[in-house]
Amino acid sequence: MRGLLARLWGGRASVSREPDARPGESGAVVSGERWLVVGLGNPGPKYAGNRHNVGFMVVDELAAQRGERWRLHKAHAQVVETRVGDAPVVLAKPASYMNLSGGPVAKLSAFYKVPVDRIIVVHDELDIPFARLKLKRGGGSAGHNGLRSITASLGSPDYVRVRVGIGRPPGRMDAASFVLQDFSTAERKELDVHVARAADAVETVVTSGLEKA
């Protein structure tokens, strides 16, 4: 998959070179440790095609690739328990609205005993053009209410972010209206590959570390 995506998109996602997830002295990821991969979005069919829901789309892709089905967890989230390489992974979609995502994420982190440094959050990013990705660990919320809620609930910003570019709104459209619109017809023609590329990046973080994604 990675070779095909590289040809289609002109190379890898741009990655912020920050400390790797649970590195040993060599910088390698410790295999067999559980990860929590959270896609952000708003629940319900009304929002399913929105730009703001691209995080849901990415974890849906990861679940579909493995033939897994979602189930409701008591932490108020849809979850899938699966594997990526040798690592057990919990995929999650909070069942709360975006600005309340932190509660379910913190509860899942506690339930599955996953520390902050093995949490990956996949979210839409206005400051990155559509069809581009950037990955980093930590940082601020940049106005993203889902990230703000997660950071507050976890008590730390030091989780990995897979920032899926949706671009800026045209003209004078406000950002809130833009993110709650469905992807345009032109964007939808490329969306499947964009989502698959983000899913591929998540897998690489889990199996090889942030610097290899």
Swiss-Prot record:
It is found in: Cytoplasm. Its EC number is 3.1.1.29. Keywords: Cytoplasm, Hydrolase, RNA-binding, tRNA-binding. The record marks 42 as: Discriminates between blocked and unblocked aminoacyl-tRNA. The keyword Cytoplasm applies. One of its GO terms (biological process) is rescue of stalled ribosome. The record marks 124 as: Stabilizes the basic form of H active site to accept a proton. It is an enzyme of class 3 (hydrolase). The active site is at residue 52. One of its GO terms (cellular component) is cytoplasm. PROSITE patterns: PEPT_TRNA_HYDROL_1, PEPT_TRNA_HYDROL_2. It comes from the Bacteria. The keyword tRNA-binding applies. SUPFAM superfamilies: Peptidyl-tRNA hydrolase-like. GO terms for molecular function: peptidyl-tRNA hydrolase activity; tRNA binding. Belongs to the PTH family. Hydrolyzes ribosome-free peptidyl-tRNAs (with 1 or more amino acids incorporated), which drop off the ribosome during protein synthesis, or as a result of ribosome stalling. Catalyzes the release of premature peptidyl moieties from peptidyl-tRNA molecules trapped in stalled 50S ribosomal subunits, and thus maintains levels of free tRNAs and 50S ribosomes. Monomer. This is Peptidyl-tRNA hydrolase. It comes from Thermobifida fusca (strain YX). The gene is pth.
